[in-house]
A protein has these predicted regions:
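Single-stranded RNA-binding surfaces
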Residues: 1-134
């Protein structure tokens, strides 16, 4: 029987978690207040920038900038994903294209197709993953 344990604690004043399987560390995560690529926010359009075609958004962690903001009006709500690290004093760069990445698959909501990792060479395993997704 596989023994799985999740440990929650603080590391250097930040929340941390670890996944241990059969006494071996499998995953380690430190939560910080800096928005990192991959985080998903429900944002509200703050003000469109007409000349650039983008817009500034309000998120729980501050201001964000969306490059492809055409057709959005002030007050509109949308889901966005952080696409890069924000420079000091600048807005968080975000995208409307949501990607949920894992070790085996990439899920692209609202887009057709299945994306299975190329590292999985075993055809049976690939078919199992496809069956789980559908």
């Amino acid at each position: 029987m596989v023994k799985r344990s999740i440990y929650l604690d603080h590391f250097q004043d930040q929340e941390a978690s670890a996944l241990v399987v059969d006494g071996v560390l499998q995953d380690f995560f430190i939560d910080n207040d800096i928005p990192t690529p991959g985080q998903i926010y429900r944002a509200t359009v703050d003000r469109p920038i007409k000349g650039q075609g983008g817009c500034f958004l309000k998120t729980p962690d501050g201001s964000a900038f969306l490059r492809q903001g055409k057709g959005l009006s002030q007050g509109s709500r949308l889901l966005v994903q952080v696409s890069g690290f924000a420079e000091t004093g600048k807005a968080i760069p975000v995208s409307r294209k949501i990607l949920l990445k894992s070790r085996y698959v990439i899920i692209t909501p609202e887009n057709p197709g299945l994306n299975i990792s190329r590292q999985i060479k075993n055809e049976e395993r690939r078919e199992e993953l496809i069956a789980l997704i559908r």
